[in-house]
Swiss-Prot record:
It comes from Deinococcus radiodurans (strain ATCC 13939 / DSM 20539 / JCM 16871 / CCUG 27074 / LMG 4051 / NBRC 15346 / NCIMB 9279 / VKM B-1422 / R1). CDD domains: uS7_Bacteria. SUPFAM superfamilies: Ribosomal protein S7. One of the primary rRNA binding proteins, it binds directly to 16S rRNA where it nucleates assembly of the head domain of the 30S subunit. Is located at the subunit interface close to the decoding center, probably blocks exit of the E-site tRNA. GO terms for biological process: ribosomal small subunit assembly; translation. It comes from the Bacteria. InterPro entries: Ribosomal_uS7, Ribosomal_uS7_bac/org-type, Ribosomal_uS7_CS, Ribosomal_uS7_dom, Ribosomal_uS7_dom_sf. This is Small ribosomal subunit protein uS7.
């Protein structure tokens, strides 16, 4: 068992442009090596690109993409009687957010566009329309949970 106290969850401050906590969390996920200014430029640049290409409010498109990528169920390994089962469990809201943002960033990293701004904008627009790498990852995870529904009674 852990000897230390459980780390308290610090509230995320909303971003300066949209006053939105989710945008701030996304910027924090984009950030590498503490370069938050660069991460902010990438995100807001992608928002400008989304605005130009779709003609819609970028925050609305981002939220739509977020909701499309958000997983409902996932599988967790559970060892019972010498064998390991992949048990489907519902995903809590904090884990939903972290998985969604993580999948979106990893999908952005795998895209072919030249700049980070173009890659992020492309992934946000694709995810908002129900396609792209992050959506594929979500579908894979939910398909795995559906395939292992027989082990749902092992849930803890």
């Amino acid at each position: 068992m852990a000897r230390r106290r459980r780390a308290e969850v610090r509230p995320v401050q909303p971003d300066l442009v949209y006053q939105d906590v989710l945008v701030s969390a996304m910027i924090n996920r984009i950030m590498r090596d503490g370069k938050k200014n660069l991460a902010s430029r990438i995100f807001y640049g992608a928002c400008r690109l989304v605005q130009e290409r779709t003609g819609q409010e970028p925050l609305k498109v981002f939220k739509q993409a977020y909701d499309n990528v958000k997983p409902r169920v996932e599988v967790r390994s559970r060892r019972v009687g010498g064998s390991t089962y992949q048990v489907p469990v519902e995903v809590g809201p904090r884990r939903q957010q972290s998985l969604t943002l993580r999948w979106m960033i990893s999908a952005v990293d795998g895209r072919p566009e030249r700049t980070a701004i173009e890659r992020l904008a492309g992934e946000i627009m694709d995810a908002a329309q129900g396609r792209g790498g992050a959506i594929k990852k979500k579908d894979d995870v939910e398909r795995m949970a559906e395939a292992n529904r027989a082990y749902a009674h092992y849930r803890w």
